[in-house]
Amino acid sequence: MEKTFALITIFLAFAFSGKCSDVFSRCDFPEGFVFGSSTSAYQWEGAVAEDGRKPSVWDRFCHSHNNQGNGDITCDGYHKYKEDVKLMVDTNLDAFRFSISWSRLIPNRRGPVNQKGLQFYKNLIQELVNHGIEPYVTLHHFDHPQYLEDEYEGWLNHMIVEDFTAYADVCFREFGNHVKFWTTINEGNIFSIGGYNDGDSPPGRCSIPGQNCLLGNSSTEPYIVGHNLLLAHASVSRLYKQNYKDKQGGSIGFSILTIGFSPSTSSKDDAIATQRANDFFNGWMLGPLIYGDYPDTMKRIVGSRMPVFSEEESEQVKGSSDYIGINHYLAASITNSKLKPSISGNPDFYSDMNVILSFFANFSSSEYDVAPWAIEAVL
């Protein structure tokens, strides 16, 4: 298996000047440590109906939830990317991590590439490179095209593996000479949970009482989507390594969101529950990527609702990442739940995990305190 290493995305509340006179400066970090900023297409670009772009699931989700904002304009990066790159230079950043809007680049499933969308990303990447900013590119950041959701339910259908691979092929071919770091999927675990268990992010599917989802099945869909994400990643990784890696010299990986879990007491039950939380939240994606299969704990608890890798699929997923991207914000203590995991009724991801999470510091759906110290336990 190819060596896998962690690429850690760290969010800083202040900028470093590049000098070593400050109490805390770049000089406190090893040579080669990369300081950068990060965003995604829907959070940054705006221009949602310009130059041939078609809606993504984020557009439909935001405009069908009246109490939500939307990304119609947002930072207006589509028009102001040169100003933003100048800010990066002024802030002394080394890198910019952004995502490509699939529905801007390919507005129809197997139709032609949108030349205006293509030119935007070429211009952005060239602007970054011209100013010494390394582009880190994500292919999917929660925003597959709405036309795929309408046609075959998007990530719930294995058909998306082929379409995602075709989309990635365009990106590698058109941008790969200047892009050395590719992430196929951003936070695969969170996309699966938020979009298909909780219903609080696109495409907004769930079956949890009180969540007001129109469609969905929280007992099965998160696991199906997670499975297809991994298969799509493996397919795209294989394409890159076979056709592009030697010529372009880049790396390709997959990212997850991690939480620093620790037991709330010294009891054996809480220690076991903490391991179970790690297996469900982190091992769900990491297990297949590193070992070729899901954690035994998940397979035992989820049972027949858990998709199964064929021997060939297992070998394709195992070792398919040159790196694992870690997005880290939070820490939580874990208490074993006295409730038995649901085997009937309406099980979901959290009832399967069957723990009580208590987040450290302030936490709400809209804001929370970052816990950088917990990343040591994650690693």
Curated annotation (Swiss-Prot):
Kindly name one Pfam family recorded for this protein.
Glyco_hydro_1
Task: Provide the residue positions that the database annotates as binding a beta-D-glucoside.
Answer: Q43, H141, N186, E187, Y329
Q: What is its EC number?
A: 3.2.1.21
Q: What does the entry give for GO biological process?
A: carbohydrate metabolic process
* Organism superkingdom: Eukaryota
Q: Where is the active site?
A: E187
- Tell me which residues are glycosylated: N217, N362
Class in the EC hierarchy, top level: hydrolase
Which InterPro entries does the record cross-reference, listed alphabetically? Answer: Glyco_hydro_1, Glyco_hydro_1_N_CS, Glycoside_hydrolase_SF
Q: Is Coiled coil among this UniProt entry's keywords?
A: no
> May I ask which residue range the UniProt record assigns to the signal sequence?
1-20
Which pairs of positions does the record mark as disulfide bonds? C206-C213
- Swiss-Prot/TrEMBL catalytic activity: Hydrolysis of terminal, non-reducing beta-D-glucosyl residues with release of beta-D-glucose
Query: Entry's PROSITE patterns?
Result: GLYCOSYL_HYDROL_F1_2
Protein keywords: Disulfide bond, Glycoprotein, Glycosidase, Hydrolase, Signal
Stated family:
Belongs to the glycosyl hydrolase 1 family.
Tell me what this protein is called.
Putative beta-glucosidase 6
Q: Which organism is it from?
A: Arabidopsis thaliana
